[in-house]
Design a protein with these regions (language model features):
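Hydrophobic alpha-helical transmembrane segments of multi-pass membrane proteins
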Residues: 7-89, 106-124, 174-189
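Short alpha-helical linear motifs
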Residues: 60, 65, 91, 129, ...
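Alpha-helical transmembrane segments in multipass membrane proteins, preferentially the mid-helix core
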Residues: 17-23, 86-90, 145-166
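Membrane-helix boundary/juxtamembrane motif in polytopic membrane proteins
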Residues: 98-105, 134-140, 157-179
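Membrane-interfacial segments
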Residues: 28, 57, 62, 95-99, ...
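Interfacial "cap-and-anchor" motif at the non-cytosolic start of specific transmembrane alpha-helices
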Residues: 163-205
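Extracellular-loop-to-transmembrane junctions of the mid-late helices
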Residues: 2-13, 116-157, 184, 188-197
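Class A GPCR helix-loop hinge within the 7TM core
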Residues: 85-100
């Protein structure tokens, strides 16, 4: 059952591995955006590891303590939200490489993350396991959908914020990638047993 529920995560790991190898083999200028992309790749890799960890705990609830199961889910949900936030910052960095975000604005942009963290710490989380599919649901999970919508909109807005920085092709790629991930998120919301978030991140790149 564990392997069956990890099929999309395995596909995501393979895609991320190919992207990582391609990135390493091709020379890049030592730009802020290049370093940030490495951070983004690392965050996605960690997210996928946590994703597979939660699949294991929820499919082995008879041998894994409830506190460990909840804690791992909390880390996983937080990692999803942080990848969303970092993706938005990366898009903004590409669109306006010369400017730096002021600390006050960073705090404003992190308000959704802060609210999500409060819910992750104190919120309710439920588990479903029918022997074939397994997933978590509840108010804690809803924070992912809310942050996904917010940072998708902000990412698209950032891509079109300044004329002449990103080409039309680059803007189209940003819009396509972010909308693709959001569509996958909507599919995940309607069919929670599919566990598509990690695959969505990999395809978005």
């Amino acid at each position: 059952m564990f392997a069956l529920n990890c099929r999309f995560q395995i596909a995501a790991i393979l895609i991320l591995f190919v992207i990582g190898v391609d990135y390493v083999q091709n020379p890049h200028l030592k730009l802020r955006s290049s370093k940030f992309f490495k951070l983004l790749l690392g965050s996605m890799a960690l997210n996928l590891c946590l994703d597979m960890g939660t699949v294991y705990t929820i499919t082995h609830m008879d041998s894994v303590s409830p506190s460990v199961n909840r804690l791992l889910h909390q880390f996983f949900i937080f990692s999803v939200i942080m990848v969303l936030f970092l993706t938005y910052l990366y898009i903004r960095m590409l669109a306006d490489p010369q400017s730096r975000i002021r600390s006050k604005k960073i705090w404003v942009l992190m308000v959704p993350v802060g609210i999500a963290v409060l819910e992750i710490i104190n919120g309710r989380l439920y588990y479903y396991n029918d022997g074939t599919s397994a997933y978590s649901y509840g108010p804690m999970v809803i924070t992912v959908y809310a942050c996904g919508f917010i940072y998708t909109v902000l990412g698209i807005r950032a891509a079109f914020h300044r004329e002449g920085i990103l080409s039309k092709k680059q803007k189209s790629s940003v819009v396509f990638g972010t909308i693709l991930w959001f569509v996958i998120l909507l599919v995940q919301m309607c069919f929670p047993y599919l566990l598509l978030s990690g695959l969505g991140f990999s395809l978005m790149l």
